[in-house]
């Protein structure tokens, strides 16, 4: 491995997250390799990154006042999702059920959490449980954006309903990363899907399989939901309207889970509000529907299912735009992501010579 891995790499890095990470992102042409790159630990995979998919969590944790620097380290490279090629693997402890990954194999996946050595770099170290082979026929660049949102959508729907066929699911926010995958996954499971989006994205959501689309620019979302048959599951990808959860008893069946995926910002008020939703008794003013903030766990079998659906043409990544590594590509990519107006996913191509 020593002969194939350079001593330095190109990586986008930031040393301050104030006021935003993109305001401080710089391309370092001589960044150090991730710690342990030449001496991999158990169940680690060194990946040469071809493309990285962006997610709001990339900057939301880093930008938490005071704590962000300690969570991700400094200087830091953002990014959790990737598609790339295996360079080397560490000892396999069999702690997770994975196939043997071979050097040269094309893979996609995600890191466990935002960290100092993210995926907006030429090399990253992924856990084996978060790294699986790209199925034949899949577009490599598109798989770079699948892991986080695909897994979130899959686990928020498949894990939360015992019987899926005919169940009514409301996805709040259908045109972003989690929403576009969520619509397709819920339909694969046989659910009836209602979602919300703005006027320009109505046709997109319908094309992905949504049965009913609420245009929040033209009507009140909660008022429309109250007119419909009760739902069995709510997945909130955006966090607005802010009173959506508190109104849930008026448009959901008793016991229907409410899964919080997205939020405008991680603030003290947001954290306190979530405590009341999750822990405070309903008779004392707390939540009257089971509420949880979505936490995903990398699972090889789930990634492989997503890959099979993509291979079979049953699941597609909706890509808003692909940026390059050079010319402030990462800066522009995060600026667009932060607007909240992207249709689907935003990708940064790390290896600009790669063509699917």
Swiss-Prot record:
Residues given in the record as NADP(+) binding sites: 57-60, 175-178, 198-201, 216, 261-262, 342-343
Nucleotide-binding in keyword set: yes
InterPro entries: ADH-like_N, GroES-like_sf, NAD(P)-bd_dom_sf, PKS_ER, YIM1/Zinc_Alcohol_DH_Fams
UniProt keyword list: NADP, Nucleotide-binding, Oxidoreductase
Record GO cellular component, one term: mitochondrion
GO molecular function: nucleotide binding; oxidoreductase activity
Induction: Expression is significantly up-regulated at the end of late growth phase, in the presence of Butyrolactone I. Expression is positively regulated by the pgm cluster-specific transcription factor pgmR.
EC number, as in UniProt: 1.-.-.-
Disruption phenotype: Does not affect the production of the naphthoquinones derived pigments.
Domain of life: Eukaryota
Keyword check for Nucleotide-binding: yes
Biological role stated in the UniProt entry: FAD-linked oxidoreductase; part of the gene cluster that mediates the biosynthesis of pleosporalin A, ascomycone A, as well as a third cryptic naphthoquinone derived pigment, all responsible for the coloration of conidia. The pathway begins with the biosynthesis of the cyclized heptaketide 3-acetonyl-1,6,8-trihydroxy-2-naphthaldehyde by the NR-PKS pgmA.
Family: Belongs to the zinc-containing alcohol dehydrogenase family.
PANTHER family, A to Z: ALCOHOL DEHYDROGENASE RELATED, RETICULON-4-INTERACTING PROTEIN 1, MITOCHONDRIAL
UniProt-recorded name of the protein: Trans-enoyl reductase pgmF
Source taxonomy: Eukaryota, Fungi, Dikarya, Ascomycota, Pezizomycotina
